[in-house]
């Protein structure tokens, strides 16, 4: 009986240790999306004036809370044909704002550059 308890305890400890090892390795690769967004969202390198853009490609184009694939906002997306305001680029990302024409609600975030066609800058002639 004691041997069975000892074996089960050892197995449980090994399982916990393996889980911690996997999570620890993943945690080292995790991105702090809030910190990355704060570091990349300042106005100092914005397009002046902002650019207008149109969503291209197929299917939903998801918003990201920061310019990194780990920062996807799963419930916020736009679709091809939607118009956006583009504030800046960072690597392969655009910082954009989308205004819902039906509700007037606006959404700001990052989107992959390949999903937006720049139409030109506001006020440019």
Model regions and ranges:
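C-terminal segment of classical bacterial N-terminal signal peptides
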Residues: 16-24
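Short aromatic-glycine-enriched beta-strand elements
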Residues: 91-95
């Amino acid at each position: 009986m004691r041997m069975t308890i000892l074996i089960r305890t050892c197995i449980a400890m090994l399982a916990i240790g393996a889980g911690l090892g996997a999570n620890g390795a993943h945690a080292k690769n995790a991105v702090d999306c809030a910190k990355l967004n704060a570091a990349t969202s300042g106005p100092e390198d914005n397009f002046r004036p902002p650019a207008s853009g149109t969503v291209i490609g197929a299917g939903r184009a998801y918003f990201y809370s920061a310019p990194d694939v780990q920062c996807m906002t799963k419930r916020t997306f736009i679709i091809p044909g939607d118009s956006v305001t583009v504030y800046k680029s960072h690597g392969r990302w655009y910082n954009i704002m989308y205004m819902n024409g039906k509700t007037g609600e606006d959404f700001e975030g990052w989107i992959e550059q390949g999903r937006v066609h720049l139409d030109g800058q506001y006020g440019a002639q």
